[in-house]
Amino acid sequence: MNLNLILPLKKVVLPISNKEVSIPKMGLKHYNILKDVKGPDENLKLLIDSICPNLSPAEVDFVSIHLLEFNGKIKSRKEIDGYTYDINDVYVCQRLEFQYQGNTFYFRPPGKFEQFLTVSDMLSKCLLRVNDEVKEINFLEMPAFVLKWANDIFTTLAIPGPNGPITGIGNIIGLFE
């Protein structure tokens, strides 16, 4: 007996690359991918790569939110204090370019599971260039507002709220649980 099952798919367009991705209902294929015991980081990477390989960290978070919603782990809409939040309003808020004293600092997005010891370590390792030249910058000697740069680089997703955007994948998942 040959069963040709067609699993439902949800189509989403990735905000950075404008690539259309099909979000699947989790099934036996995904169980087989995750059945071997691995770390949560590695399991998530395998799962997301099976859906769409080579995504940026912000796109991984975006696909993860829609994967959770489509598989019934979080709600797609939620009303809190008279304001309705909708999963389709989630957007990428990551900033990778900053201005200071006439210079433009360009950063790469940190890897999805990349770890750093300190904020200055993160900024130093993610710095691509200043203006058009590669430079070593000691971020400890810069003003304290570079901490906000680190937060803007590391925060990938946001959703509009009545009192300003709610940022971070953890906060957004918590909102829709």
Curated annotation (Swiss-Prot):
This is Baseplate hub assembly protein gp28. It holds the Pfam family Phage_hub_GP28. The gp27 and gp28 proteins seem to combine to form a small hub precursor during morphogenesis. The keyword Glycosyltransferase does not apply. GO terms for biological process: viral tail assembly. The keyword Transferase does not apply. InterPro entries: Phage_T4_Gp28 (IPR024342). Keywords: Late protein, Viral release from host cell, Viral tail assembly. Baseplate hub assembly chaperone involved in the tail assembly.
